[in-house]
Curated annotation (Swiss-Prot):
This protein's name: Tripartite motif-containing protein 59
Transmembrane intervals: 329-349
This protein's record includes keyword Protease: no
Chief localization: endoplasmic reticulum
GO biological process, any: negative regulation of canonical NF-kappaB signal transduction
Quaternary structure annotation from Swiss-Prot or TrEMBL: Interacts with ECSIT.
Organism placement in taxonomy: Eukaryota, Metazoa, Chordata, Craniata, Vertebrata
Stored PANTHER family: OUTER SEGMENT 5, TRIPARTITE MOTIF-CONTAINING PROTEIN 59
Zinc finger (RING-type): 10-60
Length: 403
């Protein structure tokens, strides 16, 4: 098939014949190739101006053609038919030029050391380059691969092999390091997640416990208030029903209403004492946990939450301004006295100082919260007791003055 392709190749452009024209000497060339030769010669005989001489590129014989030029030469219809049929068929064993459609690579460019087609030589980037036919170029380059291979010595091969092994070892070592880091990441975040999950459960458990304390504090009071309200509703219903009774029935039951009302009036309503939860989890998370290092989270203790009566300002009955001023001053004196006593205890108690100095930062924070809570509750109770005592003392003094 390759030899057959050579028969269909123009000897001038080394491409498949395009519009093949046959000369009187029986040699065939492309029409464009003959026109290029004719234009390049430019020789016209003066004595025979109506004939144009053309020298055959193969046999060098001169042919006189009509003034119409190459168009006057006959077309090689047989060759053109063969070419058309050849181009319609697929030839997978024939390598064609990637730049020129369906043009076979049948010439070897000596300058660029690559196969080219006829169009590459005439109109392409290889125009004017030295060329050689395939067979001749093959014979010249046949021993080239072996000669090039001989340039690679045994030492080079050994070095290359050792380098490959070294690269494989480094790659394996790096992959082991990466795998170890992956396992470390998984283990670290698993432990961190377990710690956070445990802390979360501890917080939720503590909140549930303080929620139970809230229920124990308020639910009985609410039930008692509901009971009193039900009694009052029953009394209101009884009062409405009496309006429809006869005078006799009315007088019999009105005393019952009077007694029930008297009982309800004498039954004191409990004072609503608000409570507060201490410490607040939201404040702990915002102020302490947000500043805690990740590695120290497992060492942070969950505080025990409690409820205590909400601290209220001490109120004084009476409308006399002098009395109020006196009691305010007395209140300041009492608070100052209590503060001095507590500061003295903290200053002179060596055991407390030793305890605070030996405790760690985390334990100190937790202990401080507990101490502050206990101290606050104690101060509040002492203050309320003193207020009550001074209130009774004031009542006693005013009664004596009144008499």
């Amino acid at each position: 098939m390759h030899n057959f392709e050579e028969e269909l190749t123009c000897p001038i452009c080394y491409s498949i014949f395009e519009d093949p024209r046959v000369l009187p000497c029986s040699h065939t060339f492309c029409r464009n190739c003959l026109e290029n030769i004719l234009q390049a010669s430019g020789n016209f005989y003066i004595w025979r101006p109506l004939r144009i001489p053309l020298k055959c590129p193969n046999c060098r014989s001169i042919t006189e053609i009509a003034p119409t030029g190459i168009e006057s030469l006959p077309v090689n219809f047989a060759l053109r038919a063969i070419i058309e049929k050849y181009q319609q068929e697929d030839h997978p064993d024939i390598v064609t030029c990637p730049e020129h459609y369906r043009q076979p690579l049948n010439v070897y460019c000596l300058l660029d050391k690559k196969l080219v087609c006829g169009h590459c030589l005439t109109i392409g980037q290889h125009h004017g380059h030295p060329i050689d036919d395939l067979q001749s170029a093959y014979l010249k380059e046949k021993d080239t691969p072996q000669k090039l291979l001989e340039q690679l010595t045994d030492t080079h091969w050994t070095d290359l092999t050792h380098l490959i092994e070294k690269l494989k070892e480094q790659k394996s070592h790096s992959e082991k390091m990466i795998q170890g880091d992956k396992e470390a990441v998984l283990q670290y975040f698993k432990e961190l997640n377990d710690t956070l999950e445990q802390k979360k459960k501890s917080f939720l458990t503590a909140l549930c416990d303080v929620g139970n304390l809230i229920n124990q504090e308020y639910t009985p009071q609410i039930e008692r208030m509901k009971e009193i309200r039900e009694q009052q509703l029953e009394l209101m219903a009884l009062t409405i029903s009496l309006q429809e009774e006869s005078p006799l029935k009315f007088l019999e039951k009105v005393d019952d209403v009077r007694q029930h009302v008297q009982i309800l009036k004498q039954r004191p309503l409990p004072e609503v004492q608000p409570v507060e939860i201490y410490p607040r989890v939201s404040k702990i998370l915002k102020e302490e946990w947000s500043r805690t290092e990740i590695g120290q989270i497992k060492n942070v203790l969950i505080p025990k939450m409690k409820i205590s009566p909400k601290r209220m300002s001490c109120s004084w009955p009476g409308k006399d301004e002098k009395e109020v001023e006196f009691l305010k001053i007395l209140n300041i004196v009492v608070v100052t006295l209590i503060s001095v006593i507590l500061m003295s205890i903290l200053f002179f108690n060596q055991h407390i100082i030793t305890f605070l100095s030996e405790i760690t930062l985390i334990w100190f924070s937790e202990a401080s919260l507990s101490v502050y809570q206990s101290l606050s509750n104690s101060l509040h109770k002492v203050k309320n007791i003193l207020c009550h005592i001074f209130y009774l003392l004031k009542e006693f003094v005013w009664k004596i003055v009144s008499h």
